[in-house]
Amino acid sequence: MSISLSESAAQRVSAFIANRGKGLGLRLGVRTSGCSGMAYVLEFVDDLNDGDTVFEDKGVKVIVDGKSLVYLDGTELDFVKEGLNEGFKFNNPNISGECGCGESFNV
């Protein structure tokens, strides 16, 4: 099982946590949503929950709950800039399709 970050994602998450002034890391999860079934969830973590798995890459801790891990195993979190837009991108080898708007996916 693994979750990784690109260098740009690790730098961005580290900066967010530093600006926030606290936090163990970043929670990566999935929830039921959208036309394809699942959507990604990103949020700061101050405390671990039972069943959480902690991955560390490039000095950043990524926390994943047990239910989400099966859908996220092998995912790389990237941070990309395209023109005036920038944001996190999920390179997930488990997805079989995405909705047209890019907000949700299925496995």
From Swiss-Prot:
Give the cofactor note text.
Binds 2 iron ions per dimer. The dimer may bind additional iron ions.
One Pfam family recorded for the sequence: Fe-S_biosyn
- Whether Iron counts among this entry's keywords is yes
Gene3D superfamilies referenced in this protein's UniProt entry, alphabetically: HesB-like domain (2.60.300.12)
- One cellular component GO annotation, for this chain's record? cytosol
Residues bound to Fe cation are: 35, 99, 101
> What keyword terms does UniProt attach to this protein?
Iron, Metal-binding
**GO MF term list:** 2 iron, 2 sulfur cluster binding; iron ion binding
InterPro entries with a match to the protein in the record: Fe-S_cluster_asmbl/transfer, FeS_biogenesis, FeS_cluster_insertion, FeS_cluster_insertion_CS, HesB-like_dom_sf, IscA_proteobacteria
What biological-process terms (Gene Ontology) are attached?
A: iron-sulfur cluster assembly
HAMAP family in UniProt: Fe_S_insert_IscA
Q: Describe its function.
A: Is able to transfer iron-sulfur clusters to apo-ferredoxin. Multiple cycles of [2Fe2S] cluster formation and transfer are observed, suggesting that IscA acts catalytically. Recruits intracellular free iron so as to provide iron for the assembly of transient iron-sulfur cluster in IscU in the presence of IscS, L-cysteine and the thioredoxin reductase system TrxA/TrxB.
Q: Can you tell me which family this protein belongs to?
A: Belongs to the HesB/IscA family.
Quaternary structure annotation from Swiss-Prot or TrEMBL: Homodimer; may form tetramers and higher multimers.
Designated name of the protein: Iron-binding protein IscA
Q: Give the species this sequence originates from.
A: Pectobacterium atrosepticum (strain SCRI 1043 / ATCC BAA-672) (Erwinia carotovora subsp. atroseptica)
